[in-house]
Amino acid sequence: RLDHYGVLDGARVLDLCAGSGALGLEAASRGAGEVTLVDSSRGASQTCQRNIRSLGLSGVSAVTAKAATFLAGAAGAPADLVLIDPPYELSEEELTAILTPLVRSEDPWLAPRAVVVVERSTRSPEPTWPAGLERFADKRYGETTIWFAEPA
């Protein structure tokens, strides 16, 4: 579906709460130029590293850090696509702590036409979008809701 938004070709992608890195690795396989996989679990980051090596994808790196901690650092080049698939037990406050730095006024993480994708349980409320980030679509798949947002 992200292919339809035209955001993957050469894109800079952040996969936050990456787990095995499946979402970010899929983006890399579909033409993303640079992918950063971020997960707080050392085991998950090691799995990401193994998956990167086994797939032979260039431009993909894995970082062991909490997403909010990673985002507190310097942004560098802005991201065109941010994928956030946190554990379902992640609190709404913790999710907001991840979303908020994406749109900070100094050194923002998002490119002007970026897409932010948040995957949550259908039992979870809609994310609290910080000022500067606006939902433009959502899609429900069984017990999962995927929310799409963009810079406002």
Positions of the model-derived regions?
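Class I S-adenosyl-L-methionine-dependent methyltransferase catalytic core
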Residues: 1-152
